[in-house]
């Protein structure tokens, strides 16, 4: 369950928004500060239309989405909590050219205004910023939603995207295995 994974990873904190003030004491209109509740760290300055999606909310919808047999593998934060992510291992394996490919689902949420909530299927096991970038860049399908008014209502789209990614991986495996089974002669290659 995602809640337990968040607790074990130390990501079970909340984000609060506060007004932003200039050194003169004047409120700066149009901006808010995203603050981590446990230590009052500023995670980012965002526009006033930015809607917070708590870590628990961002990852809770995945519990039902993932279903039986899915295991949360790892979770972490980058840049002092500005970006949080969670990785789940899917029990299904794809055999491609005789190699077992184990797919993962990576979930990413930012609190600094730098990015949307993203969900992607990937064969890359995320452990740091570089592998997170690789996983999201190399994914065949990525669902994302900006931190705006309707972000939570768009979660059904994530389910659809992941179903398409699953279908893509299955089809890719079949196509590669079919190509591998075809015999080519030198004559056919040179033609």
Listing of model-derived features with the role each one plays in the protein:
Residues 1-61, 65:
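Feature for intrinsically disordered/low-complexity regulatory segments and propeptides
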Residues 60, 66-191:
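Intrinsic disorder/low-complexity polar-acidic segments
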